[in-house]
Amino acid sequence: ENGKKHSQYLRDGELEPLREQIEQRKVLQAQLKELQAKMPKVRQPKLDFETSVIVGKGLAAMSQGVKGWGLRDCFGQLEDYLYSNESDRVCLVFGLRRTGKTTMLRQAIARMSKEDLSRTAYIKARRSDTMAMMNRDLKKLFDAGFRYVFIDEVTLMRDFIDSAALFSDVFAAMGMKIILSGTDSLGFWLAMDQELYDRAKPIHTTFIPYREYSRLLGIDSIDEYIRYGGTLRAGELAFDDEDVNAQDASFRDDESTRRYIDTAICKNIQHSLACYEAGGHFRHLYSLYEAGELTSAI
């Protein structure tokens, strides 16, 4: 002890009782070990969620597919937020379709330690979800010890823009790390201007420089970069198969280009305006929106 050796001598007649006590202790330890092995394992009670929540083994399986994929240049900002000490703020990952948003979330989950992964949940928001449902599920997750929550396509919820402060002012303030992702950039900007003012760390994924595109996909052709509009969908395909690539390219012809613009840009703008303060910001565009002609006008 403390670098010193201590010795103790036994008196005559004390050795045998001590040996008996040692043997008795060994027997009791063996019995304790046997009883502990027979005890049923305590399982965490199954949580009943209203939204689409993935935890545990499902979460680990979901992140397996992205291991070994290249990281976006902005990925470091996401991990900086996850492991920082700041509270009261959420992280927003937004941008056009096929720019790596969901992949970034899966990569962040895949790189977590086992301890952090056990406290992580992934939620895929749906149009039928509401902020009230999300609030109840987040309370259950917090009470169960979860501290990292990734919510994908959060802007699909119609009341997100007008109620987004729930994430920052309540759950982030309680110590949870909330990552919100979606394609509706206007919806996020409206939320940051009101509900999430000075309460959000934005990460914009839309712009992908050619150098980053080439690094991620291993392609040195500027023609391919232009062909896919600087998006990353090609990274999920086999470039040796020209037919598959031609069919899937977002900008392979006028029709595919128009469809991408209509769904990824025009309809997102309309969705944001419709959800923000009960559609009160359409103004003179409302007649076009009601007539279904606003997409063409945009």
Which role fits each region the language model picked out?
Residues V170-M192:
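Sensor-1/coupling segment of RecA-like P-loop NTPase cores
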Residues M104, A108:
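Hydrophobic positions on the alpha1 helix immediately C-terminal to the Walker A/P-loop
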Residues F188-I298:
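Interdomain motor-coupling "hinge/lid" segment immediately C-terminal to the ATP-binding subdomain
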Residues A37, R43-S87:
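A short, basic N-terminal segment
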